[in-house]
Amino acid sequence: MESQQLHQNPHSQHGSAYASVTSKEVPSNQDPLAVSASNLPEFDRDSTKVNSQEETTPGTSAVPENHHHVSPQPASVPPPQNGQYQQHGMMTPNKAMASNWAHYQQPSMMTCSHYQTSPAYYQPDPHYPLPQYIPPLSTSSPDPIDSQDQHSEVPQAKTKVRNNVLPPHTLTSEENFSTWVKFYIRFLKNSNLGDIIPNDQGEIKRQMTYEEHAYIYNTFQAFAPFHLLPTWVKQILEINYSDILTVLCKSVSKMQTNNQELKDWIALANLEYNGSTSADTFEITVSTIIQRLKENNINVSDRLACQLILKGLSGDFKYLRNQYRTKTNMKLSQLFAEIQLIYDENKIMNLNKPSQYKQHSEYKNVSRTSPNTTNTKVTTRNYHRTNSSKPRAAKAHNIATSSKFSRVNSDHINESTVSSQYLSDDNELSLGQQQKESKPTRTIDSNDELPDHLLIDSGASQTLVRSAHYLHHATPNSEINIVDAQKQDIPINAIGNLHFNFQNGTKTSIKALHTPNIAYDLLSLSELANQNITACFTRNTLERSDGTVLAPIVKHGDFYWLSKKYLIPSHISKLTINNVNKSKSVNKYPYPLIHRMLGHANFRSIQKSLKKNAVTYLKESDIEWSNASTYQCPDCLIGKSTKHRHVKGSRLKYQESYEPFQYLHTDIFGPVHHLPKSAPSYFISFTDEKTRFQWVYPLHDRREESILNVFTSILAFIKNQFNARVLVIQMDRGSEYTNKTLHKFFTNRGITACYTTTADSRAHGVAERLNRTLLNDCRTLLHCSGLPNHLWFSAVEFSTIIRNSLVSPKNDKSARQHAGLAGLDITTILPFGQPVIVNNHNPDSKIHPRGIPGYALHPSRNSYGYIIYLPSLKKTVDTTNYVILQNNQTKLDQFDYDTLTFDDDLNRLTAHNQSFIEQNETEQSYDQNTESDHDYQSEIEINSDPLVNDFSSQSLNPLQLDKEPVQKVRAPKEVDADISEYNILPSTIRSRTPHIINKESTEMGGTIESDTTSPRHSSTFTARNQKRPGSPNDMIDLTSQDRVNYGLENIKTTRLGGTEEPYIQRNSDTNIKYRTTNSTPSIDDRSSNSESTTPIISIETKAVCDNTPSIDTDPPEYRSSDHATPNIMPDKSSKNVTADSILDDLPLPDLTHKSPTDTSDVAKDIPHIHSRQTNSSLGGMDDSNVLTTTKSKKRSLEDNETEIEVSRDTWNNKNMRSLEPPRSKKRINLIAAIKGVKSIKPVRTTLRYDEAITYNKDNKEKDRYVEAYHKEISQLLKMNTWDTNKYYDRNDIDPKKVINSMFIFNKKRDGTHKARFVARGDIQHPDTYDSDMQSNTVHHYALMTSLSIALDNDYYITQLDISSAYLYADIKEELYIRPPPHLGLNDKLLRLRKSLYGLKQSGANWYETIKSYLINCCDMQEVRGWSCVFKNSQVTICLFVDDMILFSKDLNANKKIITTLKKQYDTKIINLGEGDNEIQYDILGLEIKYQRSKYMKLGMEKSLTEKLPKLNVPLNPKGKKLRAPGQPGHYIDQDELEIDEDEYKEKVHEMQKLIGLASYVGYKFRFDLLYYINTLAQHILFPSRQVLDMTYELIQFMWDTRDKQLIWHKNKPTKPDNKLVAISDASYGNQPYYKSQIGNIFLLNGKVIGGKSTKASLTCTSTTEAEIHAVSEAIPLLNNLSHLVQELNKKPIIKGLLTDSRSTISIIKSTNEEKFRNRFFGTKAMRLRDEVSGNNLYVYYIETKKNIADVMTKPLPIKTFKLLTNKWIH
């Protein structure tokens, strides 16, 4: 038979999209090659019919009805156009060319003996068309001898062989190839070649013989002309013209894909489910089919899927069909949930079902209903659920009723009672008989009703009938309201009785309701039970309580029915019943409709509005109000949901039975921020319910152990002290109370833990109110006493003692009296914060005072003493040795006895201490290391004595002022020794001792000259709190007409680097001093080194004690000439090195010397005072950072530091706001923000998977990212990144070893889109990597040095890139990652083999791998001290991860290295660097233009042009360009920044983004911007409007100068040596905390290769100390660079250091070791001497105006900035 000959695929899948989903006749398993007859041509259908018949007739009469076989005509079967075959199965060349088949001149490949053919087989040609039958290839035909042995195992016999085979029709078009190939395969199968045809998996059962190959080849040519074949077939045959099997294999695969849709539709249309398999399995099967169709672009809606599923449900699941019948919005997930629910319930019932059924007698008593109950006691289920093992009564859905006649408030009916339809079968069953049903069903529709029967409902409490024919004594319904399970009203027309006449004459009557709107007549078992009638479902009878059988009941379907023949009919007409209430209910609107129309208003509001005629065209009588008052709107219940109301006093009735100390309330408060570690951050309170006695315990944390210790203590205390046992503890649901440890503690002690409900804090009111009361007391006590905030718990404890002793308004006794304790002894209590003097029983010396000032806190718990706080010792003591200080002063400040020595003015300043911070605002500090809050801020009135002019007669005329204007200055928020200009204690300012300036003391910098960089009077001062003219605090305009010095103490300026600043003396004799020349340098020198010609008014900053020795560091020989350049000559070779040789070729500005300015008129040099309102320049901190005072002669520097330590504990009432709940506003303090800056947070420039692909709306970009994604996956698989042989279960692997992974996407600078699969190394566990391993990359200085040497030596520069570099490094640790998202393996893990990007160890692994390869295979050596710099005799390599830069004199040497690298790594040549013309590179972000032997230019114009506009900075491309990034004269305001939380985060993020980009550019090549970048980076966490404006100004300047480049020119070939020079500078005290800014610029052979601008790590007390610090920072890097240069280039090297500080040079040169101020700077100087002499370092002086390092340390005027930078960057 044909079915036996055809090859059947046992793995065939489901169908095609063309199948009808409603067809049930389609077989589930079809031949994948079969096609529908409707899709075939007419002659194909006929041939299909022929082939489908059984082989029971001879071949000569196989299909006599086919007219083609009777008289074949060429018209009906188109003859092949290929011509006749050759005798040996080959076409002749002419025939081949004629039929468009290529002749391959390889006849030997296909020659074979002519196989056996039947006489009926004719060679096809135009004159002899193909016959309708072709004899099959016989398996018994002789094979060649050599093939017989080869195929000896091939079966040689078939069970049945067909005599004739119907040939396929000839291919007529390319589109019909898929249909044609099906018939051709069928033809081959009928020719006994089915076992050599590949199936859909590409498998074959045996190899074909040579003869069979020729047969397939020839027949394929005969019926498939070459020019009609599809393109993909031609491509296969062009490669191998005889590879027909490949064509057939791919054709089968394509047909399988097409047929899969049909099979899926067939499977979906024929779904069946009866619960025999799990619901989960059924859901997975259906979901898989739907998902597969969706992947083929066929979307199956939820409604269609639900309909197909419901159609196949049976058994207990069939009822769902009726439930979903009327639904329009079907959800597939909801249907699956319903199926799962039924399946689970049936599973439980089957587990609980007894193994044996009871006998009939055993069920009798169980199933009978008690006559005294309202509801039946029969154990039955709702008809929604069934157990087919035994019959059950139906139970309808709840029907809520409200009636004075009803005994039960709910009735039960079917929710789908819509219409009444009857079965055709009207036969009543006999007693005890049950209708047989072929299949259990749960669907309740009209076909299930048993006509003329009542449905017995065990759940309904009322009987309902549709016909009034049986209703007796009917009365209109006026009060009964019935609703179904969906809360829909069921109208009741009438109320009456049903009269029954049972067997043996028993009559009874029950109440019934009439309604036509139900599907069945319902008989309530509850109503029957009231008449002592029960239903026995084991015998199917209605019985009396005594067992008398009244009537049989019938089981039909799943329900039990009682025949209506037992009902006595009435004579009331149906029309009468239906019209009983018609007059009352006609034309009335339902209340739910009006409720919705009027916006879900409440019942009373609607009714009252209608009564008052507030709504027109609607009357109160028009609405059906019958159930309006009880109507529950589901939308209102959801939308208007509220918490339950707490009735006042309701708690007491539940707790009256408890005795004292049996019921406790507890709660935890905290944390309190910004406290020292020794102070508690939390407290836990307890309150007894009966006595209201209170306890508080301090806590440092909320750990389980800490809480458990407190509970142990309180329980033991109550048990021992009050002889009581705690029974109940009420608390909230915080994790500190709900943990297992505490729960076990309560369980073991028999204590009931009473928790509040979710989000119900009012239920915990006792504890919450106590915490509020204690905190109110705490704030009040601390504010009154002025004590520091770390004593807050002492205030809480004091409040607890007092509250326990006072009578509350609700009680007639105090808590102590309720507890049986004595009242509080008032003589043992001191006011909180009462000043006392404590006896020091152990003084350090016999002559030291024995009294220590302190403050009383509270009575001691552990002794009869008192807890007293001692500020000087910063601790509390428990003592009775104290004396109360009787005065009216309560502030802590009054006990600093040094303040008593101050004058009256300073004492007046301490008279008041006002806070300018609102009480309710929240303080948040960013200093995580602050021990305590000292955010003191006060208004300080500076009112000095009138100034007396002390100018000579040649200068200004004196002018006496009656009174100095008063100016209020707000002190900085953070009081600290390093930042406070007044050394402020609360409300206290230390007295100032005038510092006398030596008239001869000037800066070492040459003669006095006028400022050549700016016009006279152009410099600006800026005073904070500057008033408009006319105000008392006006700034005085010091013009030439008004040249007096008065009120200068109100002028506040800051030191800008080395520029001399205004100096104000605090005595009456105030002089303005100017620079002179030829003075002795001193370590305490207050002078600076830049802009020496500008007359400056200087305010002294952190003066050193008068007894500090100064160093005469400048020998007489250096005082005689302003241009002397002292140098240090370490060895004899220094004779050939001069200052000119060091300064030669350096990019220093050319200065034109001018004659000294006439200084006879002092006022000419006093600049105007301007008030600039534009974007301010960078000038460091504001005036408060400069206005500092000298210390008293009575104290040394060490004493002052001790005093400041004490003041840090000083209380500021503003800090107690940290005890309050946080608010939406936050205040940012400048000092705290600067402390909080650790580093610039990198801004994310990459995209996640969802951003790049899933939700990317740019389709073009999305496609590029998808392409990059697949490229990355291919590369990962190629590199064997993970083990693909095994997937690991997530639960079996240690979580520490599991690394999260993700895809990141970005767009490279060249426009290509990149995808990278990376590991989340930021959350990698420390145990999974070796922290000692280092991931190294080339230092930027090393790259710049290599580029500079390449320019001077005409090197070729080659740029390479290694693809997926990290993946070449193996990983040693056992790590696992989650698979990529496209695999869909969320619960599986892959084991890593390679160092994936992002892992902590990947960089180190790759570094070790490439380092080993370069050393061992490329003969390279790594330069010591400079990682990732490798060299040999010819080539230098700089390595940055996967980027390599090669430098060589010979390009072939570079090529040799490239060849070696390509043997191991996928190496791409980015730029070979050949040629003598200008070559452009993009090396690590630098855009480099290089022309050998001439120049090199480094810039970032393209990158900045692309990136800067994306920063959302208001650039002004067409406006006036900025000429400098900032100018001196304006300062960053210290006023607190009050800002919303969200806005603050947004601005900080913006600052990070802007400064991050600026920093990247600055450290690459824009060294002239480093000062501004470094200063702004310190203010990232203080994003005030002013800081943002400064940042925008910097970005604007970068935009205006984006085309600037760092220019290098080749060194002169006449110079044989390399010259490495560092230029150093420092700006004294111009940074926060009076730190100095230091800067260094490094040059190699006159080319700037690097720069550094940073804040000094230590505070310097003079400009000389700052300069020493700057030089000490430059020398180590200078030595390291020297070593690198010598390794890369063997020329001799000269190292030079230039500074504009003569005193620093003198200190380095001097041998005097006795005059250093302290040990630190002494050792600094000594080390400098050693390094200079030991490293052949030449130190020379450079003029300040030529010092290009000035741009690293201070803001400069425009002309000065351009003058210092235009030689090396332009």
Swiss-Prot record:
Residues 1-89, 360-449, 1005-1038, 1059-1135, 1171-1222 are annotated as: Disordered. Residues 1625-1767 form the RNase H Ty1/copia-type domain. The record marks 397-398, 578-579, 1232-1233 as: Cleavage. Initially, virus-like particles (VLPs) are composed of the structural unprocessed proteins Gag and Gag-Pol, and also contain the host initiator methionine tRNA (tRNA(i)-Met) which serves as a primer for minus-strand DNA synthesis, and a dimer of genomic Ty RNA. Processing of the polyproteins occurs within the particle and proceeds by an ordered pathway, called maturation. It is found in: Cytoplasm; Nucleus. GO terms for molecular function: aspartic-type endopeptidase activity; ATP binding; DNA binding; DNA-directed DNA polymerase activity; RNA binding; RNA-directed DNA polymerase activity; RNA-DNA hybrid ribonuclease activity; zinc ion binding. The keyword RNA-binding applies. A motif (Bipartite nuclear localization signal) lies at residues 1193-1227. SUPFAM superfamilies: DNA/RNA polymerases, Ribonuclease H-like. Residues 1-39, 49-60, 399-408, 415-435, 1009-1024, 1065-1082 have a biased composition (Polar residues). Residues 295-397 are annotated as: RNA-binding. Residues 1353-1491 form the Reverse transcriptase Ty1/copia-type domain. Its EC number is 3.4.23.-, 2.7.7.49, 2.7.7.7, 3.1.26.4. It catalyses: DNA(n) + a 2'-deoxyribonucleoside 5'-triphosphate = DNA(n+1) + diphosphate; Endonucleolytic cleavage to 5'-phosphomonoester. The C-terminal RNA-binding region of CA is sufficient for all its nucleocapsid-like chaperone activities. The capsid protein forms a homotrimer, from which the VLPs are assembled. The protease is a homodimer, whose active site consists of two apposed aspartic acid residues. Capsid protein (CA) is the structural component of the virus-like particle (VLP), forming the shell that encapsulates the retrotransposons dimeric RNA genome. The particles are assembled from trimer-clustered units and there are holes in the capsid shells that allow for the diffusion of macromolecules. CA also has nucleocapsid-like chaperone activity, promoting primer tRNA(i)-Met annealing to the multipartite primer-binding site (PBS), dimerization of Ty2 RNA and initiation of reverse transcription. This is Transposon Ty2-DR2 Gag-Pol polyprotein. It comes from Saccharomyces cerevisiae (strain ATCC 204508 / S288c) (Baker's yeast). The gene is TY2B-DR2.
